[in-house]
Amino acid sequence: MIVVLRIGHRPQRDMRVTTHVGLTARALGADGMYIAADDRGVVTSIRDVADRFGGEFFVEDKVGWNSCIKRWKQDGGVVVHLTMFGLNLPDVEEEIRTKEKILVIVGAEKVPGDLYQMADYNVAVTNQPHSEIAGLAVFLDHIAPNALHREFPGAKVRVFPNPCGKTVEEL
């Protein structure tokens, strides 16, 4: 099980990016997303996509990040904080891949310093500044089994690969 925890979300500024964090998580193998802020718009957008395109994916806002992390660890899960200051992904991915319950923290603004100590792994997708969406996508591609070949049961819409154009089927 892989779940994303989005912290530092600022509703007026980060709605689009946080929505894309959730959509990326869903498409690339995560089971759900917690948002440590109150933003029904983001929740509604992600749930709408999950409803139309299928698959099981939950999204929940108004989650206290500190208590979420503590609860996750008490339940036997590991916490991975994506940060450019962490250990390089290729150096830890094999070990992380063996874990059954992974909470992936994706920050928006500067994260609290104690988060680095709370995480079991501080992981960098390069030690260079870039998008948190890109970092999550690369991380999930390396960690989630067969993420690029997933099926999404219960879809109302299906997109088919097409070398030149669009093929979309309403189910």
Swiss-Prot record:
UniProt-annotated binding residues for S-adenosyl-L-methionine: 82, 107-111
Pfam families: Trm56 (PF01994)
UniProt enzyme class: transferase
EC identifiers of the protein: 2.1.1.206
Known catalytic reactions: cytidine(56) in tRNA + S-adenosyl-L-methionine = 2'-O-methylcytidine(56) in tRNA + S-adenosyl-L-homocysteine + H(+)
The keyword DNA-binding appears for this protein: no
GO BP, one annotated term: tRNA nucleoside ribose methylation
Predominant cellular place of this UniProt entry's protein: cytoplasm
InterPro entries referenced in this protein's UniProt entry, alphabetically: Alpha/beta_knot_MTases, tRNA_m1G_MTases_N, tRNA_mtfrase_aTrm56
Leader peptide range in chain numbering: none
Keywords for the protein's UniProt record, in alphabetical order: Cytoplasm, Methyltransferase, S-adenosyl-L-methionine, Transferase, tRNA processing
GO molecular function ontology, one term from the record: tRNA (cytidine(56)-2'-O)-methyltransferase activity
Locations listed in the record: Cytoplasm
GO cellular component, one term: cytoplasm
Record function comment: Specifically catalyzes the AdoMet-dependent 2'-O-ribose methylation of cytidine at position 56 in tRNAs.
UniProt xrefs under NCBIfam families: PRK03958.1
Subunit (UniProt): Homodimer.
PANTHER family: TRNA (CYTIDINE(56)-2'-O)-METHYLTRANSFERASE
Family label: Belongs to the aTrm56 family.
Protein name as catalogued: tRNA (cytidine(56)-2'-O)-methyltransferase
